[in-house]
Amino acid sequence: MNRQRTTGLLATIVLLASLGSACSKGDDKAVKGRNGPNGAAHDTVSDLSLNEDGLGQIQIGMNLDDAVNMGLLNENPTMNKQCDYVFPAVGAGIPEGVSAMVVRGKIVRIDVDTGTVTTEDGAKIGDTEDRIKSIYGNDVTIEPHTLIDGGHYMTVLGDSASAGKALVFETEGQHVARFRAGRLPEVKWVSGCS
């Protein structure tokens, strides 16, 4: 009887340990996966990429207060409520060179001015205009830059899931100097909130 009890207890311990291990593996995937409860689409900062809908957990259309409460963006106490920029919170894991345009409390655009952020298709600062054309093909429209002689705005409208949103690459004529993603019309505002 004592031996049966010991064997049963040992089997229960092994079963509980197996379940605990399986649950913790699933939790990692739930948090890191695109459909996870926190909406994280990337496992590391190195593969954080911009698309028409946002950058990681910072989503176009999101309330600024929500992004601040999640520790993604800093508050701006002197913010112009009509239109202003905010920057990533320290420790948020967002690379330098990223800012978010906020209009009436909503994130409407994310700008990348420097750094290592790429689009989900791999486009980045320093790419040639030809590379942008090769990535986006007929989806890219090219217009003359209003502030840089010889420069261009290369705009890629979002697909049906991202209707009303776009990516905009600014070039000095040959290379991407900066790019952004967001909703129309704000993503096409040439001078930001000015």
PLM segments and residue spans:
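Glycine-centered tight-turn and secondary-structure capping sites
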Residues: 61, 120, 124-127
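Short, recurring structural edge motifs at helix starts
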Residues: 51-57, 116-121, 156
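N-terminal low-complexity, Pro/Thr/Ser-rich intrinsically disordered segments
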Residues: 31-62
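Bacterial N-terminal signal peptides that target proteins for export
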Residues: 1-10
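Bacterial signal peptide processing site
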Residues: 24-26
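Short, low-complexity, Pro/Ser/Thr/Gly-rich segments in the mature regions of secreted, periplasmic
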Residues: 182-194
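A cross-family detector of function-defining hotspots
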Residues: 31, 63-103, 129-175, 181
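C-terminal motif of bacterial Sec signal peptides marking the signal peptidase cleavage site
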Residues: 19-22
